[in-house]
A protein has these predicted regions:
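Conserved class I S-adenosyl-L-methionine
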Residues: 80-115
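Core SAM-dependent methyltransferase catalytic element
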Residues: 145-147, 169-196
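A short acidic, Gly/Pro-enriched loop at the edge of an enzyme's catalytic core
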Residues: 41-51
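A short SAM/SAH-binding and catalytic strip from SAM-dependent methyltransferases
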Residues: 49-65
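Acceptor-substrate binding/catalytic loop of class I
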Residues: 85-96, 121-137
């Protein structure tokens, strides 16, 4: 038996890395490189018992109502959606966590253009477009698509040293140094598509 697993990412490099790990571990997962909004079509209407989303996904998505619609389309009746994601409060601060620089939630994207290490030769610039969605936007993306929230959690730690200046904890997680758990860094949601 076993689970049928399909991974979706918009990055071909991430998909190639996942395929290599899949082969190395002797697993039988499949992978699809596409925009998440196109996933129901690209996966030919497949439905799943569980759809899981983890760290660093929501900030790339402009429309969370459409995202919730995709999740609902991809879940079987009675299926669960699980997300563990960086908290929107985290993205309000500068990299030193010393001052608030960005909005908690806004419809307009943040657009950052950065020079690459070869900028002086070819004027190479990389544009990054992200959104900071507040928790109400995330939850309404689910609720407006008939997904029922079963649990919600907030956590004051991160699995990664996001900005290079976070304090390492004994359990391998990271917290904002000097803030003693004052800033939420992660949130989690479990939502279910009702059975008909």
């Amino acid at each position: 038996m076993g689970a049928n697993i399909v991974g979706v990412d918009f990055s071909e490099e991430a998909i190639q890395t996942a395929k290599s790990l899949n082969e190395e571990l002797g697993l039988n997962a499949q992978f699809c490189c596409c925009n998440i909004y196109d996933a129901p079509i690209m996966l030919k209407g497949q439905k799943f018992d569980i759809v899981y989303t983890s760290y660093g996904v929501v900030n790339w998505l402009p429309d969370l109502i459409q995202w919730g619609q995709v999740l609902s389309q991809m879940l079987k009746d009675g299926g669960k959606f699980v997300i563990v994601e960086f908290h929107p409060v985290l993205w309000m601060f500068d990299e030193n966590f010393s001052q608030v620089r960005y909005a908690y939630s806004r419809k307009e994207p943040y657009i950052v253009e950065e020079s690459t290490y070869t900028d002086s030769e070819n004027d190479n610039r990389q544009k990054t477009v992200t959104w900071n969605h507040g928790l109400a936007v995330v939850l309404n993306g689910l609720l407006n698509n008939d997904l029922q929230v079963q649990s919600f959690g907030e956590y004051d730690y991160s699995p990664f040293n996001l900005f290079g200046n976070m304090a390492a904890e004994k359990n391998g997680t990271f917290k904002v140094a000097g803030k003693n758990g004052e800033i939420p860094l992660l949130f989690s949601v479990v939502a279910v598509k009702p059975s008909k």
